[in-house]
Amino acid sequence: MLHCGALYGIVESAVIITVTAAAISTQRVPGSHRPQVTLLYVGAEDCAPCREWQQHEKIAFSTSAEFARLKYREIKSPSLLNLLKDENWPEDLRSYRGLLGPDAGVPLWLVIADEQVIQRGMGPTQWRSDVLPKIIKLLR
């Protein structure tokens, strides 16, 4: 039951192309790939902590340099009781719905890097202690 209230490593690499008069060479350089980062917010209109986050911390975060460098998606249900219904989930995000689990609370965030969930957090405390720091680290 949802209530109001799996880290994967990222393999990083990039290709550096060096152009000289004699030849073109490619070299793989570990650690230089920046993942495509998506932040998925899941909440409900009748959830007080969700409204609080939307009105304060989301507004502050939306003006940050990190926010400008990620893709932000929202799942906002009119009611907590209907949060998991198909009409609240765009088709391309439904695969993440199963990751919420029966004990999940909202507000909830999934940090997704290159289509892999690498951080899950619930509630304002985990937003500040886990989710936001993970986003900042990924986007450095």
Question: What positions do the PLM features span?
Answer:
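The canonical Cys-X-X-Cys-His
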Residues: 47-51, 109
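Short active-site neighborhood of thiol/selenol oxidoreductases, capturing the structured segment around
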Residues: 34-45
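Short, internal strand/loop/helix patches
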Residues: 85-105
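Thiol-based oxidoreductase modules, predominantly thioredoxin-like and allied folds used
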Residues: 66-91
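Non-catalytic, surface beta->alpha helical segment in thiol-disulfide oxidoreductase systems
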Residues: 103-140
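Extracellular/periplasmic catalytic domains that process cell-envelope and extracellular macromolecules
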Residues: 33, 66-67, 101-105
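Bacterial N-terminal signal peptides
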Residues: 5-19
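Typically the conserved alpha-helix immediately C-terminal to a functionally engaged Cys/Sec
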Residues: 50-66
